[in-house]
Amino acid sequence: MEHFDVAIIGLGPAGSALARKLAGKMQVIALDKKHQHGTEGFSKPCGGLLAPDAQRSFIRDGLTLPVDVIANPQIFSVKTVDVAASLTRNYQRSYININRHAFDLWMKSLIPASVEVYHDSLCRKIWREDDKWHVIFRADGWEQHITARYLVGADGANSMVRRYLYPDHQIRKYVAIQQWFAEKHPVPFYSCIFDNAITDCYSWSISKDGYFIFGGAYPMKDGQTRFTTLKEKMSAFQFQFGKAVKSEKCTVLFPSRWQDFVCGKDNAFLIGEAAGFISASSLEGISYALDSAEILRSVLLKQPEKINAAYWHATRKLRLKLFGKIVKSRCLTAPALRKWIMRSGMAHIPQLKD
């Protein structure tokens, strides 16, 4: 049975960044359910916008995005729609429009060969025994069993590692539903849509490489019905759909209290969305995935005596920032306050008309 210093479950932005940063410094194995290349297999449903905080992370690491990761067009504002109040406002934003699946595969491609990576793999079981973490996974057509000193859960909203460490932990979840359509709008745009009759979260749209993507986060019970109802409402705001080319859905976490952020215990750690590190006001998670990976890298390499406590302490600033997003979310989803902000015209950039 092979033994490693670190076993990473999941190679989204958080897991890929950590594996790359630990390469050559610790013996690392990493498991991921995505394929190494191509569009077959799992791909994460996501609007695919790289926020300024994520961009700063790449600046610190000296990385530049390859052209095949960047999508067209690049949009500099978000059209914010309050459906009930029939209000639309434009706010400046500095996102980079990306192809999320290509981005994830590019992040994986940066992991050095010294890391043992298993693509298209499935983690079947984890447990702790004799001060080691045991991992059973299936890859390349057969089942394997390894041990590791440290276990890292970078496995997203439905994290197996989080469920094992915190079996009684409850965090609010939504079903994120997206559909892709052939682009029909004469001017591409990115939008953020609020309708409290549909969801107490929000919905979105983005123009990307000739497609119009429309999606949102909805209650788990009847999300599909609510999604369809909202699509019908959006015709009043000149949204054009047609026949869906592709439909996607996944679970997304929605932290709503301080206790929703969990970092791990017993030499196991959580990073990215698995830890609850996702913005409640925008559902943006890439920047927090990259930041938490960098924090954990630093902690693992320093090897403090109480290593889980050190990671918890080191993420305090990140958790405070995310708690601020919870407060912001409550403001944005409060109909009266949102209506007042939008009617005030604060930060709104009106579009010139011919």
From Swiss-Prot:
InterPro entries: FAD-bd (IPR002938), FAD/NAD-bd_sf (IPR036188), Geranylgeranyl_reductase (IPR050407). GO terms for molecular function: FAD binding. PANTHER family: CONDITIONED MEDIUM FACTOR RECEPTOR 1 (PTHR42685:SF22), GERANYLGERANYL DIPHOSPHATE REDUCTASE (PTHR42685). Transmembrane segments: none annotated. Signal peptide: none annotated. Belongs to the CbrA family. This is Protein CbrA. It comes from Escherichia coli O157:H7.
